[in-house]
Amino acid sequence: MKKILLTLIAVITMSASAFAQANSDRITFGMGVLYENSLDATIAWEHETKYHNAWEFFVNGNVKWDECQSCGHICPDSFWKNYRTWGVGAAYKPCVVRGRNHYGNLRIGDSAGSNTDKFLGGIHVGYEHNFALRKGWVLFVQAKCDLLIPDREDLFREGITVGFKIPTIKK
């Protein structure tokens, strides 16, 4: 009886966890540093389809800091009031690398938003590597390149973002 009960528990546990990564939804929080003095933050909702391919709908904010003219350091005015952008967009993320407890996606998307003066359109290309943690949480590292149109001050933004994906309520 004890063997049958242990076998039944093992089968139920394995079958329940076998579909843990399929068709799941996650809330994503990421923050990173981009080339030429920029801090980037993204909040997103991600829907994962078959084979770790995913759709992401995101809100992105970026702050570009500069050294203060009066003190020569980075102060609150030179950080927060220098140059800011925000955007809302979508990205498709096909899976290109799969392994045990990790997978990698290309990230291809676009966005629309604004800086402090005018409209900005963005084209986003990058690579995201995901590491599965416990209870459906995921740690990700993202290398990104953003092309902002028609802005000449901040045309290309390249950098690295690190964040977490938190699972939503299961269906």
Task: Identify the residue ranges that each predicted region occupies.
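Cleavable N-terminal export/targeting peptides
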Residues: 1-24, 168-171
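Short glycine/proline- and aromatic-enriched beta-strand/turn motifs that initiate or cap beta-hairpins
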Residues: 20-65, 165-171
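Short glycine/serine/threonine-biased micro-segments
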Residues: 28-30, 107, 124, 161
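Solvent-exposed loop/turn segments connecting transmembrane beta-strands
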Residues: 29-42, 80-84, 111-121, 148-157
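Noncatalytic linker/hinge segments flanking ATPase motor cores
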Residues: 37, 67-75, 145-153
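Gram-negative (and chloroplast) outer-membrane scaffold detector with strong preference
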Residues: 46-139, 166
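Outer-membrane beta-barrel "beta-signal"
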Residues: 88, 154-171
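Internal, hydrophobic beta-strand segments that form the core of beta-sheet-rich folds
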Residues: 141-143
